[in-house]
């Protein structure tokens, strides 16, 4: 037995792994500033370019199409070249594509830029999950995932703080250029800091032993064909298919809902959106913390993850009635709790691949699930565009949002009733 990494009994476990999470967190902040800018500018861009609800739905659709295709590929790429270069390449692609929005002169130009953004951003979560699988033991992964996933909410908070001011002062083109160029600062830091744990000079023996405390995974190449025969692959992927579209809806249509229902505009979106995504942060970190805490108390992975997911699914149900809220702040509370529930649910669903699959397969399973999630988003975006054009109300859309998480949990439980390690 190799004991070279074993610490002395009195040696304190280091915390360098949390530096890695902080970098992932920062990347997700940038990711969501880039992703959400279009949703915040929808009313202005629709007016300037004469977009219909169907045109905007197409814009979202093609972003998700490229995201779906690329997500599958990124999972495999992360397994092949690792999180350092895989994440770095993905980041560079999405930042360049974000800046390219400034050159769009019509719907086709925006679609082209959005598709480039989708290709790059699709690598964000497979890379993040891969990095967490490399740097954390199973009992800490949901919490670590929740922390870096909380960066998406901070990005969603930063966007209404920054983008309206830039847009009103310098025009919408500069909103894309300024945020894109500023975000590029992250890339060299990531490439300088990130290494696999055993290759990292700043990692102590105690922390390395802590990271590697789980039984070693068998080292073998695992193809998609084999993964697609596993029920756990479909548990994760169908869960993503059902819940990812709800988050896409919040991200791309929430400013439009607040504008149409409560008369908000680019100058007044800020406080309600910030409140919603602050609540989302609580859910992201809280969902990961709850399941990790239950496991520390002796609960099984299966019981801890699914109990947390059930709590989150129930908290999402009231969003069905968001359209009926009598004032904007009641709507903000209802929607904010639902977005928090989504993030808590997601933090635990995201860990399913690393909980049950060998590390060599994690990126590929995450890629398959991400592709299914984006495909679900494509279907839902078309549905949203159709509903808004034909009916003009968000009520049917919120009804779907309120029920999706309970259905997703049922599917996950039926396909992976025990969340036991998969035999490859």
Positions of predicted regions on the chain:
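Residue-level signature of mid-helix packing/kink "hotspots" within the transmembrane helices
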Residues: 36, 64-72, 156-157, 277-281, ...
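Extracytoplasmic gate region of multi-pass secondary transporters
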Residues: 38-39, 231-287, 342-346, 350, ...
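Extracellular/periplasmic helix-loop-helix junction of adjacent transmembrane segments
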Residues: 39-69
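C-terminal ends and interior cores of transmembrane alpha-helices
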Residues: 92-105, 310-326
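Helix-loop-helix hairpin linking two adjacent transmembrane segments in secondary transporters
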Residues: 148-201
């Amino acid at each position: 037995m190799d004991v070279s990494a074993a610490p002395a009994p009195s040696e304190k476990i280091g915390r360098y792994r949390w530096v890695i999470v902080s970098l992932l967190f920062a990347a997700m902040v940038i990711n969501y500033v880039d992703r959400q800018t279009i949703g915040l500018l929808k009313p202005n861009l629709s007016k300037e370019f004469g977009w219909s609800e169907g045109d905007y739905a197409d814009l979202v659709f093609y972003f998700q199409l490229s995201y779906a295709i690329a997500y599958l590929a990124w999972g495999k790429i992360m397994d092949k070249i690792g999180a350092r270069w895989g994440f770095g390449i993905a980041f560079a692609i999405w930042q360049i594509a974000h800046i390219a929005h400034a050159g769009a002169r019509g719907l086709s130009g925006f679609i082209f830029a959005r598709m480039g953004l989708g290709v790059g951003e699709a690598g964000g979560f497979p890379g993040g999950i891969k990095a967490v699988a490399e740097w954390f033991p199973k009992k800490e992964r949901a919490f670590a995932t929740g922390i870096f996933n909380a960066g998406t909410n901070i990005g969603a908070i930063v966007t209404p703080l920054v983008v309206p001011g830039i847009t009103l002062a310098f025009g919408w083109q500069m909103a894309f250029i300024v945020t894109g160029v500023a975000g590029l600062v992250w890339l060299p830091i990531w490439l300088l800091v990130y290494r696999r744990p055993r290759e990292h000079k700043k990692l102590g023996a105690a922390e390395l032993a802590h990271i590697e405390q789980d039984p070693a995974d068998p080292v073998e190449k695992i193809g998609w064909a084999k993964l697609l025969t596993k029920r756990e692959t479909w548990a994760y992927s169908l869960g993503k298919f059902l819940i990812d579209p709800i988050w896409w809806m919040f991200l791309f249509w929430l400013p439009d809902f607040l504008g149409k229902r409560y008369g908000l505009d680019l100058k007044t979106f800020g406080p309600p959106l910030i409140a919603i995504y602050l609540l989302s942060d609580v859910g992201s970190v809280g969902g990961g913390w709850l399941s990790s805490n239950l496991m520390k108390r002796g609960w099984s992975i299966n019981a801890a993850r699914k109990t947390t997911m059930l709590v989150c699914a129930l908290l999402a149900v009231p969003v069905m009635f968001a359209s009926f809220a009598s004032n904007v702040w009641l709507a903000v509370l209802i929607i904010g709790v639902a977005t928090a529930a989504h993030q808590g649910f997601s933090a635990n669903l995201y860990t399913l691949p690393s909980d049950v699959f060998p590390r060599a397969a994690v990126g590929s399973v995450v890629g398959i699930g991400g592709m299914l999630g984006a495909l679900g988003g494509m279907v839902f975006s078309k549905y949203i565009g159709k509903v808004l054009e034909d009916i003009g109300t968000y009520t049917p859309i919120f009804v779907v949002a309120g029920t999706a998480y309970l259905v997703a949990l049922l599917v996950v439980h039926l396909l992976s009733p025990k969340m036991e390690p998969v035999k490859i």
